[in-house]
Amino acid sequence: QKLTDTPLTNEKFGWLSGKTISIGYGIADALRINFVGELGWELHHPIEMQNYIFDEIMKAGEEFNIRPFGIRAMDSMRLEKSYRVIPKEMSIEYSAFESGLDRFIKLDKSSDFIGKTALKKSMEDANKNNFVTLEILDTKDADARGSEGIFKNGELIGRATSGGFGFRINKSLALGLVQSEYSKIGEKLEIEILGNKYVANVISEAPFDPSNKLLMS
């Protein structure tokens, strides 16, 4: 808040909203969303302003011991929220329904849109796969990274699209696609990591802060 005249309170700048704000003498489009499941904003700005805005944020945050974090940390946190990413969980290999994006699709819209016909056909064909979040048990020295096979009773029934360790919840996680009949919460599956198979349970999406309290705080 020290960097901008725009009020950043929940009342003035709520979750899932956006505004153009000033940051020092820089300008950015601020979106009250993020990819890590915490209270925060995405800042979209001209590339020539990037170093200045970054430096201003770091200086303003010194009293709070602010520190940058890397892409691996961000990936770990997005797994804990079951956030999909292109081209891993969202790909031309499978439909938006298979990626678990049903709530963003309205096939009954009166207007046409790109992909509507293909989406209707994918529904008629019935989804072959469903998106799942997996908790991997008993793995101590390696986590899934993506493309690992997922099995049921020794039969290959899907594959991981992403994986890693969730440090906020202290669990090894994977996102993936499995045959629809094996996608129910509580289903016990296996995943092969570096030649070894581990128990992988289907769990609810967003094992970290499932009600989004932090995002809306």
Where are these regions (language model features)?
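Conserved, structured C-terminal
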Residues: 1-217
